[in-house]
Amino acid sequence: MKDPEIQEKGSVQKALMDKKESAYKKYVSLFVGKKGIWQFFKYECIILLFSWIPGAIGLFLRKIFYPFLFRNVGRGVVFGHHITLRHPHKITIGDNSFIDDYVVLDAKGEEDRGLFIGDNVIVGRNTIISCKGGSIHLDDFVNISANCSLLSESLI
């Protein structure tokens, strides 16, 4: 087995193994994306308070509070429960889109391109959409079935 210091590592592994960074800074870098205590506090409070609530009350509360995390959210967007968000400030969601339960929206990466979800898009339950340095653009009226994975290191 290769020495971990010599072995090539991806950006996530480099961030996690960096002994110079605190656990807080690693977490902010991997999940929140934007630096600063206000961004961290806002992200943590909204996720902690509203991500797990089922039913109509949860849908209503997420509709009000989740848009504060994103780059832009259109009208009539529905957020299911237990959605995982990474770097939500790089995510744009168009009008009348539906993000089902247990979806992962990951716009992590060095560049600021991120994830664009158009109008009237449905993202099915347990789907992972991940931009690892690339970007993903889902045009209007796209329907992604349940349990799918879309991963990009360039452009989809």
Predicted segments, located by residue:
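Terminal amphipathic alpha-helical/low-complexity segments used for targeting or macromolecular assembly
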Residues: M1-R75, F141
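Short, functionally important structural connectors and interaction interfaces within domains
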Residues: F65, R75-V77, L85, C148
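Flexible, glycine/small-residue-enriched loop-and-beta-strand segment within the central core
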Residues: T84-I93, F98-I156
